[in-house]
């Protein structure tokens, strides 16, 4: 019996992608960094989503063998849709990671992470040999916090030690 998952086949980005042309150019550049055998950490967000399409194109055209460690379920489902092999931080360490930033100031300080994938994105970045933070002109601000608040998160495990 053959079973098809229509959810994966019909997967698309949930919102309109702003600055799509700029993000696609950056996505092509990041995808161009992949080498055969690379284990690549993939953050979350629309630019990461577009970069996966560019990576999938290289995999198909060049018979490139890579593995992706996704930071979110959405990025994992995109990898499935595109036929990109996945692994986990439990099994492998990423050679490099790419992710987007939410805001970047004139001194190259940035806010990274406003969503549910924030903790795993941080784990990918810390465990990678190299990290590429993807930014288009829409992310440039004069002062951090101009567009979005800076989020804080806590891990519930050591909370009794912080009281």
PLM segments and residue spans:
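Alpha-helix C-terminal capping segments
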Residues: 81, 126-128
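N-terminal active-site beta-alpha-beta segment that forms phosphate/nucleotide-binding
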Residues: 2-99
């Amino acid at each position: 019996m053959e079973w098809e998952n229509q959810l994966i086949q019909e997967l698309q980005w949930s919102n309109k992608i702003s600055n799509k042309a700029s993000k696609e150019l950056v996505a092509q550049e990041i995808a161009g960094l992949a080498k055969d055998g690379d284990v690549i950490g993939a953050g979350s967000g629309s630019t990461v989503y577009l970069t996966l399409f560019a990576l999938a194109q290289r995999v198909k055209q060049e018979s490139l063998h890579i593995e992706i460690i996704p930071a979110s379920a959405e990025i994992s489902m995109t990898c499935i849709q595109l036929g990109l092999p996945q692994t986990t931080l439990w099994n492998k360490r990423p050679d490099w990671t790419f992710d987007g930033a939410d805001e970047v100031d004139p001194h190259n300080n940035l806010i990274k992470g406003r969503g549910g994938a924030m903790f795993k994105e941080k784990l990918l970045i810390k465990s990678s040999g190299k990290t590429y933070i993807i930014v288009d002109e829409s992310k440039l601000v004069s002062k951090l916090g101009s567009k979005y608040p800076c989020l804080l998160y806590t891990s519930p495990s050591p909370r009794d030690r912080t009281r």
